From Swiss-Prot:
It is found in: Cytoplasm. It comes from Prochlorococcus marinus (strain NATL1A). GO terms for biological process: chlorophyll biosynthetic process; protoporphyrinogen IX biosynthetic process. Keywords: Chlorophyll biosynthesis, Cytoplasm, Isomerase, Porphyrin biosynthesis, Pyridoxal phosphate. It catalyses: (S)-4-amino-5-oxopentanoate = 5-aminolevulinate. GO terms for molecular function: glutamate-1-semialdehyde 2,1-aminomutase activity; pyridoxal phosphate binding; transaminase activity. Gene3D superfamilies: Aspartate Aminotransferase, domain 1, Type I PLP-dependent aspartate aminotransferase-like (Major domain). The keyword Transferase does not apply. The keyword Flavoprotein does not apply. Belongs to the class-III pyridoxal-phosphate-dependent aminotransferase family. HemL subfamily. Pathway: Porphyrin-containing compound metabolism; protoporphyrin-IX biosynthesis; 5-aminolevulinate from L-glutamyl-tRNA(Glu): step 2/2; Porphyrin-containing compound metabolism; chlorophyll biosynthesis. The lineage of its organism: Bacteria, Bacillati, Cyanobacteriota, Cyanophyceae, Synechococcales. Its cofactor is pyridoxal 5'-phosphate. PANTHER family: GLUTAMATE-1-SEMIALDEHYDE 2,1-AMINOMUTASE, GLUTAMATE-1-SEMIALDEHYDE 2,1-AMINOMUTASE 1, CHLOROPLASTIC-RELATED. This is Glutamate-1-semialdehyde 2,1-aminomutase.
Length: 428
């Protein structure tokens, strides 16, 4: 496979941007290679600057649930573009997307739009503290809530990719109020509440962990968190930046039947444009400025282009049979991967929910980040390189979830499974 042009562009980029990229995982450092440089995307496919085509299971890290450059999304964007790219003022599109989010997500009675998932999580932490009058927060090992200082504690994902326990430049004082527990360990959470009476503002988590690979909640875990937070006068926050509108129309909270107090969102609700949001009970959200004293603002928040792409994407997702199709397609893909590995005697453990999936190169089960780290990352790096040569683009990290889309066909899934079969057979 010829990647000469990608190599040239990335070589130049390293003199222009730190590591040659705008986000660390894109550098392919954890898979011991140089990144491919994309030229265009369409449907389930991505083409690099050398003309190679890939079946894409990264989907711009989650937003492309309808497939890249969906014609209806593009048409809607072109219409809005004629009216301007940014108003810096209220527009009716904000109302429309807000109504759709409120109708869909059980916990959300009011919503505030921002520009990224990181920004949403930063704001929601401030809101948790403002509403409760408490400073401490509990997060889980391997759960990633963006690159804000107070969340870069045992954060999985990009931090794990770099092999760092946390990040230099984050003062201890900044994270002193961030408490951590193993994911799926309810007793550890109860112990933290017992050790810090009337001091914990709330618990924030990815209800399905997509930034430590793909880890699902054990039966009773989410329900237990809901109970223990209520008992202690603390808030429960679901970070649904990744799972929102992806594992069901109403997100993980609809899927599992557990309603948090607050929710952060991003990715899908922007249809491929920069976006984030946080929302929850009206009683809590009324504290956000200008209604209340908790300040948060943004120059491009509620950008008309992002609102337009989000509205059209949610309209497409609301069509009958959408999530049944995604569930079946993703299950077929994962089952094929697991079967192919087992036929070649390669240890593997994996799971899928709707349009998300992940696998670990170990026996499993994987219930938390510590168990996830037993996955064979060197073997994953080799598989990643070989899959690229077969025309399949997987996330360039052993600790990232994979994504399917409505644009993926049975033929795409079959071709991907065949590529895995050939590679597993070759390396076994």
């Amino acid at each position: 496979m010829n990647t000469k042009r990608s190599e040239e562009i990335f070589g130049a980029a390293k003199n222009l941007m730190p590591g040659g990229v705008s986000s660390p995982v894109r550098a392919f450092k954890s898979v011991e290679g140089d990144p491919i440089v994309f030229d265009r995307v369409k449907g389930p496919y991505a083409w690099d600057v050398d003309g190679n085509r890939y079946i894409d299971y990264v989907g711009s890290w989650g937003p492309a649930i309808c497939g890249h450059a969906h014609p209806e999304v593009i048409a809607a964007l072109q219409e809005t573009l004629e009216k301007g790219t940014s108003f810096g003022a209220p527009c009716v599109l904000e109302n429309q997307l807000a109504e759709m989010v409120i109708d869909a997500v059980p916990s959300v009675e009011m919503v505030r739009f921002v520009n990224s998932g990181t920004e949403a999580c930063m704001a929601v932490l401030r809101l948790m503290r403002a509403f409760t009058g408490r400073d401490k927060v509990i997060k889980f090992e391997g759960c990633y809530h963006g690159h804000a200082d107070m969340f870069l504690v045992k954060a999985g994902s990009g931090v794990a990719t770099l092999g760092l326990p946390d990040s230099p430049g984050v003062p201890r004082s900044t994270t002193a109020n961030t408490l951590t527990a193993p994911y799926n360990d309810l007793e550890a959470v109860k112990e933290l509440f017992a050790e810090n009476p009337d001091a914990i503002s709330g618990v924030i988590l990815e209800p399905v962990v997509g930034n430590a690979g793909f880890i699902t909640p054990e039966p009773g875990f989410l329900e237990g968190l809901r109970e223990v937070t209520q008992e202690n006068g603390a808030l429960l926050v679901f970070d649904e930046v990744m799972t929102g509108f992806r594992i069901s129309y109403g997100g993980a909270q609809e899927r599992f039947g557990v309603t948090p107090d607050l929710t952060t969102m991003g990715k899908v609700i922007g249809g491929g444009l920069p976006v984030g949001a946080y929302g929850g009970r009206k009683e809590i959200m009324s504290m956000v400025s200008p209604s209340g004293p908790m300040y948060q603002a943004g120059t491009l928040s509620g950008n008309p282009l992002a609102m337009t792409a989000g509205i059209k994407t949610l309209e497409l997702l609301k069509q009958e049979g959408t999530y049944e199709k995604l569930e079946a397609l993703t299950k077929k893909l994962l089952d094929g991967i697991l079967t192919a590995a087992k036929e070649s005697n390669i240890p593997i453990y994996g799971q899928s929910i709707s349009a998300m999936f992940g696998f670990y190169l170990c026996e499993g089960p994987v219930r938390n980040f510590e168990e996830a780290k037993s996955s064979d990352t060197e073997l994953f790096s080799k598989i990643h390189r070989l899959m690229l040569q077969k025309g399949v683009y997987l996330a360039p990290s052993a600790f990232e979830a994979g994504f399917t889309s409505l644009a993926h066909s049975e033929d795409d899934i079959n071709a991907t499974i065949k590529a895995f079969q050939e590679i597993f057979s070759e390396i076994s």
